């Protein structure tokens, strides 16, 4: 997976004529009330700092990285999620498409009960048409987010970003996750989000959303890593519960 990203980075950059579009580099930063990924609260209900950077070549190839703070109550021994991604995207008439590789890294994080790291890699196929989009992510590494022998796990993400006018956008999302591997189906889930984003001058934006996930079983209802805290109690939570998330972001 990382090899794919390094190959993309090694692509030759050809001189552009004055009429050719130039490659673009952008960066972003956010402060959010909590980090929600695929319906789950990654920061145990606490705020998160997030930042990323993207490079896009006019040929359609791109590379990027993104990071967020996370909670070690949800991801054992983790404080940061660090993503690397790259691939190709383009359009045919009004239909957009993308083929991307992702690698999600959680430095120092290991689920101690099994010795499995939380790091994993995915291939992603995406389509978009006007305000609609659909994306399917397929796990290509042996393990998925601390779950062993889960190669082939899939996540379907569909939604719409509806222009409401006056710089407002309605954000709609539904997701469906299926965890591969013997006995791993207890971690299957669905999730949904309804939110709005308001764009401002200077690359600023503000957003608010309500999210919720539903487990196929009660495995998420009293989630714990099984390690006593200083008081000798187990930290438990339902990371899939409905929650409101607000954020302010800046694009550079």
Q: Model-flagged regions — what are they?
A:
Residues 194-204, 235-252:
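Outer-membrane beta-barrel "beta-signal"
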Residues 18, 54-58, 89-93, 126-132, ...:
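Structural signature of outer-membrane beta-barrel channels/translocons
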Residues 16-71, 243-245, 249:
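Short glycine/proline- and aromatic-enriched beta-strand/turn motifs that initiate or cap beta-hairpins
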Residues 1-24, 252:
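Cleavable N-terminal export/targeting peptides
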Residues 23, 45-49, 78-82, 95, ...:
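Residues that define the transmembrane beta-barrel architecture of outer-membrane proteins
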Residues 25, 59-65, 93-99, 131-136, ...:
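Repeated loop/turn-to-beta-strand initiation elements of outer-membrane beta-barrel proteins
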Residues 31-37, 67-71, 90, 103-107, ...:
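Transmembrane beta-strands of outer-membrane beta-barrel pores
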Residues 118-191, 210-211, 251:
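Detector for outer-membrane/organellar transmembrane beta-barrel domains
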